[in-house]
Amino acid sequence: MIKKKNKKRYTEVSALGKYIPMSTHKARRVIDQIRGRSYEETLMILELMPYRACYPILKLISSAAANGIHNMNFDETSLIISKAEVNEGPTAKKFKPRAKGQSYPIKRSTCHITIVLRDISLNEKYEEYIRKPWALLEKSNETEIRKRN
C-alpha cells in the first residue's frame, strides 16, 4: 500500500524581538490593543498611538509580514495577528552614587516580544471572518478554555 504525503500548507509566520530595552508592562499596554486585528488596521493604530513602545512593535509586525510575503507568498491584505505576547527579559542592574556615600540601585528592564501573523485566506472560515471578525476570535477563545479544563 502506498501512502500519500499530506502537503500541509503553513498558515502562520512569526517574528521575535529579544532584549528590547523596555518594561513589559509598557509593551503589553500596546500589544493588548492590536491582538486579533488585521495587519493593515494594526499599522494604522500603531502609527497613531502616542507610546514609545509602538515603534519596536511596528518594526516586528512589519518584519513578520515581510517574512510571510517573501517566504510563504502570503497576501498582505489577508494577514491577521493571531498571537502577540510579551515576556520578561533579563534586568541590567547598576548602582548610582547618592549623598553621604550611599548608593541607589538602578534596574534597567528588557523584554522579549513575539508576533505571529496568520493568513486567513488559506483558512476555510475566511468568508466568515470577513462578515464577522469577532466570531473567529470568540471560537478560538472557547477552544483555549476547553483545553485548559
Curated annotation (Swiss-Prot):
Natural source organism: Pelargonium hortorum (Common geranium)
Subcellular location: Plastid, Chloroplast
Complex and partners: Part of the 50S ribosomal subunit.
GO biological process: translation
GO cellular component, one term: large ribosomal subunit
Function, as annotated: This protein binds specifically to 23S rRNA.
Annotated protein name in UniProt: Large ribosomal subunit protein uL22c
Keywords of the record: Chloroplast, Plastid, Ribonucleoprotein, Ribosomal protein, RNA-binding, rRNA-binding
Superkingdom field: Eukaryota
Main location per the UniProt record: plastid
GO molecular-function term, one example from the UniProt record: rRNA binding
Gene (UniProt): rpl22-A
SUPFAM superfamilies associated with the record: Ribosomal protein L22 (SSF54843)
Gene3D superfamilies noted in UniProt: Ribosomal protein L22/L17 (3.90.470.10)
Similarity remark: Belongs to the universal ribosomal protein uL22 family.
